[in-house]
Regions:
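Short beta-strand edge/turn micro-motifs at domain boundaries
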Residues: 140-154, 170-208
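Short amphipathic beta-strand and strand-loop transition segments with alternating hydrophobic
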Residues: 100-111
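C-terminal motif of bacterial Sec signal peptides marking the signal peptidase cleavage site
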Residues: 18-22
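Mixed-charge, low-complexity intrinsically disordered segments
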Residues: 69, 128-173
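Bacterial N-terminal signal peptides that target proteins for export
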Residues: 1-9
């Protein structure tokens, strides 16, 4: 089950490939709406406001975020023959459920040094903190059933069932406030960088 531990360890990093696009160059750029709609689109699958800000269709916004997310997961298995395509698809579906656990509230915005600092109130989920225990429980169940953990279908079921078990016992910790920067990129558009998204991700889904 060493391979299983490897994928569980990188679970928290998979979701950091945000695919959040930079937004307006305009002076009337609504930072709060941008951050709120970006998080709503990425975590909760609510694309309308995000699409409006980017001036694209909801369909394109959904495609952009889902493709980036799916690709980030697929890359983790590129060097593995230990899981089927269906297994990866099932696993991706479970991680989409994990994303929906995200609890956040965009609060104050301060303009600083040509960019913006945004305060986001976050309730930490313990879904990744319980994953190790969940995987141990599921693995032991499979062993008792006489199943081979190296079998691709068994391996996939252990991954998805481990995530499901942690989803079912999810709880939230004390609210924390995270400050993120919204800055201009090379094209002059404002956006949340992967580094800033990582700050939020680490607060919403701590692994330790």
């Amino acid at each position: 089950m060493k391979k299983l531990q490897k994928y569980l360890m990188i679970l928290g990093t998979i979701m950091l490939s945000s695919g959040i696009s930079a937004c307006s160059k305009q002076p009337d750029f609504d930072v709060k709406s941008y951050v709120q709609s970006s998080l709503d689109a990425y975590y909760h699958g609510e694309y309308k406001d995000y699409a409006n800000l980017l001036e694209i269709s909801e369909k394109d916004a959904k495609k952009e975020i889902e493709e980036d997310f799916n690709e980030s997961i697929q890359q983790q298995f590129d060097d593995s023959d230990n899981i089927t395509d269906k297994g990866i698809a099932d696993y991706t579906e479970k991680l989409t459920e994990v994303k929906k656990l995200a609890k956040y509230k965009v609060q104050d915005v301060k303009e600083e040094d040509g960019g913006y600092t945004v305060s986001v109130q976050v309730e930490p989920s313990n879904v990744f903190q319980t994953l190790q225990q969940s995987s141990t429980e599921v693995s032991n169940e499979k062993i008792k059933q006489g199943l081979d953990g190296n079998d691709p279908e068994v391996f996939a079921s252990v991954l998805t069932e481990s995530v499901q078990k942690s989803l079912e016992k999810n709880s939230y910790g004390k609210t924390v406030t995270v400050k993120v920067s919204v800055e201009k990129d090379n094209s002059g558009k404002y956006g949340l960088s992967d580094t800033e998204m990582s700050k939020l991700e680490a607060a919403m889904f701590p692994t330790e």
